[in-house]
Amino acid sequence: MELSDEMLKEMSYVKISQYRTKVMKALEDDIKIPSKIAKDSDIRQNHISKVLAELRAHELVECINPEVRKGRLYRLTDKGNELVKNIE
C-alpha cells in the first residue's frame, strides 16, 4: 500500500518518540482511559496526558467524552488506525 506524504510525515512524528509509539500501539483496536494506557504501555501516567494531547493535535487520537473530568475515553481516529497498522 502506497502511503501519502502526509501519512509518512505523521508516521515519522510518531516513531521519533517511543512514548507516542507505545501509546498508539496501546490504543490499537481498543478504547481506554489514560490510566489503562499508562499500564499497558509501561509509561508513567503523568506523561500520558502530554502524549495524548500531542497525538490529538495531529488528529491521531480522539477523546470520546471530553465533557467529563475523570474517566475520559480515548481511541485512535481513522487516520491513527491507518498509521498504527504501518508501524513496525
Identify the residue ranges that each predicted region occupies.
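Short alpha-helical segments that sit at the start of domains
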Residues: 1-21
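Pre-recognition alpha-helix immediately N-terminal to the DNA-recognition helix
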Residues: 18-25, 82
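Short capping segments at the starts of secondary-structure elements
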Residues: 29-33
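A short acidic, leucine-rich amphipathic alpha-helix
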Residues: 36-40
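Key DNA-contact positions within bacterial/archaeal DNA-binding proteins
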Residues: 46
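Short, hydrophobic-biased segments on the C-terminal half of alpha helices
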Residues: 52-56
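Glycine-centered, phosphate/nucleic-acid-interacting loop/turn motifs that mediate DNA/RNA or nucleotide
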Residues: 59
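Basic, amphipathic "hinge/linker" alpha-helix immediately C-terminal to the N-terminal HTH DNA-binding motif
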Residues: 68-87
